[in-house]
Amino acid sequence: MLYAAGVEPDVFCGDADSVSPEVAAWAHASARTDIRFPSEKYATDLALAIDCARHEAARRGAQLQLTMTCASGGRPDHVLAVLGQLAASADAQARIVEDSYECRVLSPCGASSWMVGDEEGALGATLSAIALRPDTVISERGLKWELDHRRMELFGDLGISNVVVKPSAEVVCHEGVLAVFLVRQGASIS
């Protein structure tokens, strides 16, 4: 993605086993910092990248903020592992931005709310909220079905397929960790 956009990475971290040799060579040469790992290891590249980003944020005295794309590589098993990694790093204010949707991980120890009504094309869009920790408590305003300090079951379906109806729409995570998906209108997640 960075290669195609012509954006050079600050840090390259991983084994480069899921990109072409050309892109791997470019990433290794372009990054200011290049941290390589063997392809056979006991952690995913995402887990290593989060640790690397946490270290870099601490070195800079900055708060950890993660924005990702192509995070799952199109694999359903990776989707669940990605959400698990982001739940374990709830302070990271994580965002996954894809063509058809955006996902934010909310938690009181990181970004606790998302003003979804501020997003371009949000009005009328589908919004789903899924608890990534037991006993997650959320509020939703400006959606077709609103919730007020409602406790959610881990991976339960209470927050699935809501609709943004007001420009002031907001989702707040009071306790636990929450994945909030804003699905772009006309898009389907495959």
Model-derived regions, located:
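Short beta-strand segments
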Residues: 69-71, 97, 130
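Residues at the C-termini of beta-strands that transition into short coil/loop
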Residues: 16, 38, 98-100, 133
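Low-complexity, flexible helical/coil segments
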Residues: 3, 7-9, 25-30, 47-53, ...
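Glycine-rich loops and low-complexity Gly/Arg-rich segments
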Residues: 18, 36-39, 91-94, 121, ...
